[in-house]
Regions:
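A cross-family glycoside hydrolase active-site/sugar-binding cleft signature
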Residues: 75-77
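Non-catalytic terminal accessory segments
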Residues: 89, 170-234
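Extended active-site neighborhood of metal-dependent phosphoesterases/phosphodiesterases
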Residues: 1-73, 83-182
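Acidic, metal-coordinating catalytic cores used for nucleic-acid/nucleotide bond scission
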Residues: 80
Length: 234
């Protein structure tokens, strides 16, 4: 996060960037919403932990402004619940303890509930809902992947994520289970689209011609710029 902070959030060297003036002072935020809801935007980059200043900022906001009974929508950089399941199936571990710590130590101990997890990264839509057995009498937690704004579509049929398990990290934190409630595209539609890639050359024949021309021109320009000099043998 230090590089992002230095470029976009620091007064050192000015805040102008491409004709714009940056105003943010951190890469994460907390926004108060109506009806006692809060929007919390964390910055874990990709496969990185929430750093200490970020965690302390969330703790400070919770202590000074939030109240017991408030609810949180937590925005993440990636669907850690999906990656944790995928790693578990491969016999590996995907560390999600920082998010569990944020939920349990920063919010839950103050009576604040994280009810919605919202992320992108994977370019499709998938919503997991906490099972009734796991939620008990409480309102089920929602975990939503909404990455439809990506330049391409990620498949939804490659692995089975119909049921997820969030492991307990201590005796005080219970394990939780989630079931998929909605997916777009559906697994069947995703599989059909994947098989359709075999016909891509016939569906879009110009796509192969254009990159080939660009690569050829690039190679010619590089060769011309270097004067056609090749390294001599020793």
């Amino acid at each position: 996060l230090s590089a992002f902070t230095r470029l976009f959030c620091s007064d050192i060297g000015g805040r102008r960037l491409a004709g714009w003036w940056t105003r943010q002072r951190r890469s994460y935020f907390v926004l108060k919403l109506p009806h006692r809801w809060w929007l919390v935007g964390s910055d874990g980059q990709l496969q990185s932990d929430l750093d200490v200043p970020q965690m302390e900022h969330f703790r400070d906001i919770a202590e000074r402004h939030m109240q017991a009974g408030d609810k949180v929508i937590l925005c993440l950089s990636q669907p850690v619940w999906v990656y944790a399941q995928k790693y578990r199936n491969m016999g590996r571990v995907f560390d999600e303890t920082d998010l569990i710590y944020l939920r349990e130590e920063v919010y839950a101990k103050r009576g604040i509930d994280v009810k919605v997890y919202l992320t992108g990264d994977l370019h499709h839509y998938r919503r997991h809902e906490e099972t009734r057995e796991s939620a008990g009498t409480a309102e089920p937690v929602q975990k939503i992947t909404a990455g439809g704004g990506g330049a391409f579509l990620h498949p939804t049929h490659e692995d089975d994520f119909s049921r997820l398990r969030e492991a307990a990290i201590s005796e005080d934190v219970r394990s939780r289970t989630f079931e998929v409630c909605a997916t777009y595209p559906s697994t069947a539609q995703s599989a059909r689209l994947a098989w359709g890639n075999l016909l891509f050359l016939f569906k879009n024949p110009r796509f192969g011609v254009v990159p080939a021309a660009i690569y050829l021109m690039t190679a010619w320009l590089v060769g011309a710029a270097s004067g056609g000099v090749s390294p001599s043998n020793p």
